[in-house]
Structure formats: structure tokens, C-alpha cells
């Protein structure tokens, strides 16, 4: 299991959900509080995610991984 630290996901960071990348699209972190990250994804809207349960990958602002 990959350890992910909540501090990596600051507001404004762009991410993709590794398992749902094509379905959800690119997301932008809105907040990260108490091991919960709120992200607004382009295809499915706002999701609140526990980074210990969902693998997220940080991407650059142009959307390339």
C-alpha cells in the first residue's frame, strides 16, 4: 500500500483518481481537513475523499501526468 500524506494535497493542486481517471477527469483540491480532501472533478463534480482509501496522483496544471 502506498502511503500518502494529506499535506501533499494543498488547495489549488490538480489531481486525478488513479482508479477513476477517465470517468472523473481532472480534479482541483478545494480543501484538506482531518484526512479528508474535497476535490472538484471536471466530470463528476465535488467529491470528499479519504486519501488512505483512494489513490490520487498529483498532475501539473496542463493536465499531463
Model-derived features with residue positions:
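Mixed-charge, Lys/Arg-rich low-complexity intrinsically disordered regions
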Residues: 1-15, 23, 63
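Short beta-strand-centered aromatic/proline hotspots
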Residues: 24-32
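Intrinsically disordered, low-complexity, charged/polar segments
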Residues: 1, 45-65
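SH3/SH3-like beta-barrel fold
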Residues: 37-42
